[in-house]
Design a protein with these regions (language model features):
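Bacterial N-terminal signal peptides
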Residues: 12-23
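Catalytic domains of lipid- and phosphate-ester/thioester hydrolases
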Residues: 4-9, 24-449
């Protein structure tokens, strides 16, 4: 064998070894198993410290999807709440942001939610230059185009969303995990993705990970954000290991009151349906892996978790079991909806739009309409509780009809739904500009401002 041939073979061998090494280094992290589901531990609402700015009021923020547009819009809402003072039911003056007990977020809104939960007030000094005014989309494209990343991207198990997760750690989250989030004193942060196989909402909380028999505390926040914003086709799914069935998890005891009823009360029926959808995640034998995509596919305004919690609260109140939410006198929900609906020129031409435009519009229209229905459903629940409480108060002890008594068994809390959206600016010169902003991970600085 000639020296030239030997030299060429060495180079080929070196390249092969380098490629294999790169693939090995790029193996996605695995969410570790737990041997026993412990209902009193981990990152969940029940373990969060009390937010005592006003114990009678529960303030919930729901941050919608929409790329950097959504991240900036939700950040602006936090700035407003930080600068707004209120007088609590105890007579104390405080910042409205300190009364927030829960923040939900999907897709672009998940970044603001997670970052605020991690950093608290420090976010207001750093978020703009670390994320909002950064060309995150451009940086992702550059990384994907770098040859050293190609072997990893071709490995089949380490996709574009894992590449994105690495970037999110570098610029925003600093490898923080949900254990770090649990140690914070802020509100409960609930971000969600969508299970690709079933279309079900997947929430990043220990209750969900109990079903998977896995420890959420060791999952990085960047992976949750990457999963919540993994736009199908554009970004790859984020894969979670399913250890379900190995830690003794069982559905909550309250479900036994309704599972075997042929005619459960309506809120209970919806809550049971949600619980059965969650139970499907617990079969780690036939579903050892879960592939997660953008949370906006199943819930683009971050409201499904809130609605489920209210319906469970109503169902438990019906059977006389109190809940933390049910003890509040007022529940205030800010729906921070960055949905935009820019006009299209299609109706001014006899030529129909192309295949790509049709595909994008077909995917977006059902999501937008479902988002509208979620907000209206919240208002319906608010109205039903108010009316039923009024009827019960007026009937008092004279209500003898058991059906009326049953129908009026709703929590005494008042629900206030506040829609924070671009639609409120219609007629304002800024509306057209904001409504035309793209759903991407880059925005001009003036749009953020």
């Amino acid at each position: 064998m000639s020296s030239c041939l030997r030299s060429a073979l060495r180079r080929v061998g070196l390249l092969c070894c380098l490629s294999l090494a790169l693939v090995a280094c790029a193996t996605p992290p695995i969410n570790p198993p737990i041997t026993q589901a412990a209902l009193g531990g981990g990152y969940r609402l029940e373990t969060r410290p009390a937010r005592n700015a006003d114990p009678d009021n529960l303030v919930i923020l729901a941050f919608s999807g929409g790329g950097t547009r959504a991240a900036a819009f939700s950040y602006g809402t936090l700035e407003f709440l930080r600068s707004t003072e209120f007088v609590s039911s105890t007579g104390n003056t405080g910042r409205l942001i300190d009364a927030v007990g829960v923040i939900t977020g999907v897709s672009g809104g998940s970044f603001t939610a997670l970052a605020y939960g991690l950093y608290g007030d420090r976010l207001f000094d750093e978020y703009e230059h670390r994320f909002l005014k950064r060309d995150v989309q451009g940086e992702l494209i550059k990384r994907a185009a770098t040859p050293t990343h190609w072997p990893s991207l071709l490995s089949g198990t380490w996709g574009r969303s894992e590449l994105a997760s690495e970037l999110y750690d570098e610029i925003l989250f600093g490898n923080a995990t949900f254990a770090d989030l649990q140690r914070s004193q802020g509100p409960m942060i609930q971000v969600s993705a969508t299970d690709l196989s079933t279309g079900a909402r997947f929430g990043f909380n220990q209750g969900m990970f109990d079903i998977l028999c896995s420890d959420l505390g060791q999952v990085r926040l960047s992976r949750a954000a990457a999963a919540s914003s993994a736009v199908p086709v554009v970004l790859s799914p984020v894969t979670m290991r399913n250890h379900g069935g190995s830690c003794g998890w069982a559905p909550p005891a309250w479900t036994d009151r309704f599972l075997h009823s042929s005619n459960p009360p309506r809120p209970a029926a919806r809550a049971i349906r949600s619980m059965r959808a969650l139970q499907a995640f617990g079969d780690g034998t036939t579903r050892p892996y879960l592939h997660l995509v953008d949370g906006g596919v199943s819930d683009n305004v971050g409201m499904r978790g809130v609605l489920d919690a209210l319906e469970v609260t109503e169902a438990l109140h019906f059977v006389g079991e109190p809940t933390n939410i049910g003890r509040s006198k007022r529940i205030v929900v800010f729906v921070v909806n960055s949905l935009s609906s820019p006009p299209t020129p299609w109706d001014r031409s006899d030529t129909p739009p192309g295949a790509v435009d049709i595909m994008l519009k077909s995917a977006g229209v059902p999501i937008d309409h479902f988002s509208y229905e979620s907000i209206e459903l919240l208002r319906d629940i608010s109205m039903r509780w108010r009316v039923m409480n009024d009827i019960r108060a007026k009937a008092g002890a004279n209500a003898a009809d058991p059906d009326i008594v049953a129908a009026t068994q709703v929590p005494p809390a008042e629900i206030y739904a506040i829609d924070v959206s671009f639609a409120a600016l219609k007629g304002d010169p800024e509306f057209d500009y904001l409504n035309s902003l793209p759903t991407s991970f880059t925005l001009p600085d003036e749009a953020v401002d």
